[in-house]
């Protein structure tokens, strides 16, 4: 039997989320502290008393008492369990109505296609069936969008995992670019708040050059403070005394 609880503790929420394959920073309880211009709520879902799903919700108040609800990179659950998925979606609809939400936007990490280690890209065989079932439950899918503005979180990601990285497997041009940068005095520096001023200055220059709007220094400071032991700034620093 499935049940749910609104307002679970941050400890219980994080303990469950961190143990799941879909664990994501945006579903951590601390993300509500970063997005402090939204209200937030945590919902736990249970099967016979054992937690099987979680949703960290961001709630934006609108005029006339309405709201919108956003669950970034969540809910966290086993999407292959359609019975559980049905219960979670119905619960979120009920929760949305209680908050007078115009809509509840979910944003789970469901991989459609991936390429690992430079191999041929492979389609995930099960994801389409999950999407079909979500549609049957009344969920609207944004589709395989291509423009950045079409989604809140990036739909396409390029991840290189440390355990899989091999310099020799990089394309020849990439390896040459790295060697050239190193020889010219470009070094990778990883740090924290001591790099914040330099990093913020670079972001501002990027804004001016590209004609876009990025986050400001205070936002990066908030991330470093909120995730003190898990957040870092990576900068490429140039020193002119290296070999020409």
Question: What name fits each language-model region?
Answer:
Residues 33-119, 240:
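Conserved donor-binding loop and adjoining core beta-sheet/short helix segment
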Residues 242-244:
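Positively charged, low-complexity/disordered segments
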Residues 6-48, 54-64, 139-150, 159-161, ...:
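A conserved beta-strand-loop-helix scaffold within acyl/acetyltransferase catalytic domains
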Residues 85-187:
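Acyl-donor-binding surface of acyltransferase catalytic domains
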Residues 80, 122, 191:
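Conserved aromatic-histidine-acidic binding/catalytic patches
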